Amino acid sequence: MKKSLITLALITITGTAIADSNSGHKEMGHNAMGHSTEMTMDHSNGMAMEGMTDVGMPAAGAKPTKVVHVLLSDDMKIRFKKEVQIETNDVVQFVIMNTGKIDHEFSIGSASEQIEHREMMKAMGNHAHDSGNAVTVKPGKAKQLLWHFHGEKNVELACNIPGHAESGMIKKMAL
């Protein structure tokens, strides 16, 4: 009984002390807390997630409304096995097959985002990577990408491995 009373008293005292020490914190500005007002945090991209683009975002875990089979080939073409009309708000499961003998990338974005990604790939050398809006597919292999289309209506699919898009490995779509 005595231990219970001591424990209860300690919890009460500790809780009160913590509450008192935090009570004025909300009212204090950055200056009052000794923080510089010259530096501010940029929260403009606070909601951005990996792979989010001007034309949509990854849709991991979502149920696709359409399935599109994509063929990447060494003749530097991106083809749909069967043509399909993709619309705004569609969730598309892309099944991407590399039918060639060299690596290819499948990237989703706006034309300006693809140019930016292409420049990054050139600067990095032939660095294969997967991200929310792009996958690199080895020869004879397949990968999947689940994508929710929204935003800009002009979409560009591209292989941004150096030299590939420049050789025509781009597919343009209008939603």
Which functions belong to the PLM regions below?
Residues 30, 35, 41-49, 132-175:
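Extracellular/periplasmic metallocenter environments
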Residues 82-107, 143-151:
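Beta-strand cores of secreted/periplasmic/IMS beta-sandwich domains, seen most often
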Residues 61-91:
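N-terminal edge beta-strand
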Residues 112-123:
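Short aromatic-acidic-glycine turn motif
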Residues 42-65:
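A eukaryote-biased signal for short, well-structured alpha-helical docking elements
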Residues 1-19:
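Gram-negative bacterial Sec-dependent N-terminal signal peptides
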Residues 19-29:
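Cleaved targeting-peptide boundary
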Residues 121-131:
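Short beta-strand and strand-turn-strand segments in soluble, beta-rich domains
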